[in-house]
């Protein structure tokens, strides 16, 4: 029984199952919401152009404690902020992605958050 629990826990944390680790796309738009929640923070963006134009795209980030360690705060991203986020997209084409080894541009300021790197 403990073997099956380990397998489930391992699968939960496998980004490779949900996201394409090879492909990277840029999501550009305005922040709708920045969710500072465990186990991972998320930012939701109304997409301005490209394949997801007019849709809200969800981006998975690191944990609140990891982001805070890197200087982030729960108020870093505000609704209406212009962002460009490089993400590893969903394997099934859903409007969701993972920000790992990504570049984040907030209102024209480029940053490469250390905490989101492999």
Positions of PLM-derived features:
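Short aromatic-glycine-enriched beta-strand elements
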Residues: 37-48
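Structural detector for short beta-strands of small beta-barrel domains
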Residues: 23-39
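Short, mixed charged/polar active-site loops
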Residues: 26, 53-56, 110
């Amino acid at each position: 029984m403990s073997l099956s629990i380990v397998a489930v826990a391992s699968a939960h944390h496998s980004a490779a199952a949900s996201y394409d680790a090879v492909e990277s796309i840029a999501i550009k738009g305005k922040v709708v919401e920045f969710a500072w929640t465990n186990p991972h923070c998320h930012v939701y963006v109304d997409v301005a152009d490209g394949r997801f134009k007019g849709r809200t795209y969800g981006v998975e980030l690191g944990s609140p404690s990891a982001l805070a360690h890197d200087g982030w705060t729960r108020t870093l991203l505000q609704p209406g902020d212009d962002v460009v986020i490089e993400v590893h997209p969903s394997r099934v084409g859903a409007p969701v992605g993972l920000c790992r080894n990504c570049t984040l541009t907030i209102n024209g300021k480029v940053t490469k958050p250390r905490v989101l790197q492999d």
